[in-house]
């Protein structure tokens, strides 16, 4: 497997820390050791997150092509678009963001706080669109690129989650290689890796990266899309393409993609009571914040799987904290009583 042949533009601080979650582990019975790899602390660019790791492999292509405008898309509280806006500002590029109405959540300040607020502060051209949730290629995004061209600019397309870009999975192949190096220092290997999945390239990259040492099926995706069949298919497709790109040396199959579908509801962007309880529990046990859209759902999944005994006693489980906390302000009503 050869990741080094792909150019990478550094946007992160370096390897992200692995933090033992000792109090949470003890609270859940102490039979399973929980750890978190803090992708939410990976960069100084507007709070960073998992998309910043992915963008390190997309940006060299944008620069090589002489593009002057990054064009991306997401929901109103998209972490992706905030990270793209930050990277554009950092590189002195323009940025156009399409923010669609992916979440059925009504709050007077939902489109004015959190991620979208930061994108505006960062200087992005933010365009609200009424279209609902989907993880595929969107007409509104294609129109935004056409608008840039019509104005004489040269757009660089960054799809939702970076996932439909052919290089979108590379960052999290690198994540797996980084974990292996950290495991060598720690003196043990993680038995399971838990990660939130929606557009798919984060888990896809991990599946490929951990397939290199026989752990593809130990990457446990927690679906947050509430469209699990579409998400599973997209993870598999991206993983297969990424495996070919990096020369994994074996085919990725549907059995390599593990996606737990119990925690994505009631729908994308809306948390269940179990997710809200998981957010509070993690915060109060560890001082670590998660969000209602993504990381709260994967935290809910991990906690519930421990409670159900789905991780064997003695397991070491690595929770991938992908970011997302800037969206908390948009859900302040849900936490008005703590």
From Swiss-Prot:
InterPro entries: ACCD_DCysDesulf, ACP_carboxylate_deaminase, ACP_carboxylate_deaminase_bac, TrpB-like_PALP, TrpB-like_PALP_sf
One biological process term in Gene Ontology: amine catabolic process
Source organism, top-level taxon: Bacteria
Record's catalysed reaction(s): 1-aminocyclopropane-1-carboxylate + H2O = 2-oxobutanoate + NH4(+)
Positions of post-translational N6-(pyridoxal phosphate)lysine modification: 51
Cofactor requirement: pyridoxal 5'-phosphate
GO MF annotations in UniProt: 1-aminocyclopropane-1-carboxylate deaminase activity; D-cysteine desulfhydrase activity; pyridoxal phosphate binding
Sorted UniProt keywords: Hydrolase, Pyridoxal phosphate
Active site per database record: 78
EC number from the UniProt entry: 3.5.99.7
SUPFAM superfamilies assigned: Tryptophan synthase beta subunit-like PLP-dependent enzymes
A Pfam entry, by short name: PALP
Function: Catalyzes a cyclopropane ring-opening reaction, the irreversible conversion of 1-aminocyclopropane-1-carboxylate (ACC) to ammonia and alpha-ketobutyrate. Allows growth on ACC as a nitrogen source.
Family matches, as HAMAP family: ACC_deaminase
Family the UniProt entry places it in: Belongs to the ACC deaminase/D-cysteine desulfhydrase family.
PANTHER family: 1-AMINOCYCLOPROPANE-1-CARBOXYLATE DEAMINASE-RELATED
Subunit structure comment from the entry: Homotrimer.
Protein name, per record: 1-aminocyclopropane-1-carboxylate deaminase
Species of provenance: Methylibium petroleiphilum (strain ATCC BAA-1232 / LMG 22953 / PM1)
